[in-house]
Amino acid sequence: MVYFMFIMLVGLILGLMAVASNPSPYFAALGLVVAAGVGCGLLVGHGGSFLSLVLFLIYLGGMLVVFAYTAALAAEPYPETWGDWSVLLYVSVYLLGIFFVGKYFFKEWGGLGWVGVEEMSNLEMIRGDFGGVALLYANGGIMLVLGGWVLLLTLFVILELTRGLSYGTLRVV
């Protein structure tokens, strides 16, 4: 299980680097899907199945809409790929930064970092994930509604930006 979680952590870092290096909106959307899937898999591995499902739906439902309309707005005839020199420079700087930060904090990263939610306490009556669900709908209900409203507002802003003169979102770029 530790090896599986380590591979998922490496996949999360690679997915986030694909989004941050941003060669083209097409590849950044692919990196976002990889990062969201692997990050939610990490949460499932640590015992947060409901939270990972909610985050996965928010990422794919909200952010991929933004990336789809960004790709429609910024359609390039020859998009940059991950093999271009500028993108490789960004990726190498990110890898060096991760290496030096990892080397600096290596001693503090040991210990309980691989322990799931249920392995910390033996006499709990409910799982840790279900306690989080209760807090999400009780105390965090306002933030849940606010987050949904912000995603809806973002969708309308992107639709308005890509609308064009009078052709709607199906205009020729």
From Swiss-Prot:
The molecular function terms in GO held by this entry are: NADH dehydrogenase (ubiquinone) activity
- Entry's transmembrane regions: 1-21, 25-45, 53-73, 82-102, 141-161
Report the EC code(s) recorded for this entry: 7.1.1.2
Location comes to: Mitochondrion membrane
Q: Taxonomically, which superkingdom?
A: Eukaryota
What are the GO cellular component annotations?
Answer: mitochondrial membrane
Q: Does the keyword Protein transport apply?
A: no
Q: What class of enzyme is it?
A: translocase
List the catalytic activities from the record: a ubiquinone + NADH + 5 H(+)(in) = a ubiquinol + NAD(+) + 4 H(+)(out)
Mind telling me which InterPro entries this protein's record contains? ComplexI_Subunit6 (IPR050269), NADH_UbQ/plastoQ_OxRdtase_su6 (IPR001457)
Topological category with respect to the lipid bilayer: Multi-pass membrane protein
Q: Give the family this protein belongs to, as stated in its UniProt record.
A: Belongs to the complex I subunit 6 family.
Protein purpose: Core subunit of the mitochondrial membrane respiratory chain NADH dehydrogenase (Complex I) that is believed to belong to the minimal assembly required for catalysis. Complex I functions in the transfer of electrons from NADH to the respiratory chain. The immediate electron acceptor for the enzyme is believed to be ubiquinone.
- The protein depicted here goes by the name NADH-ubiquinone oxidoreductase chain 6
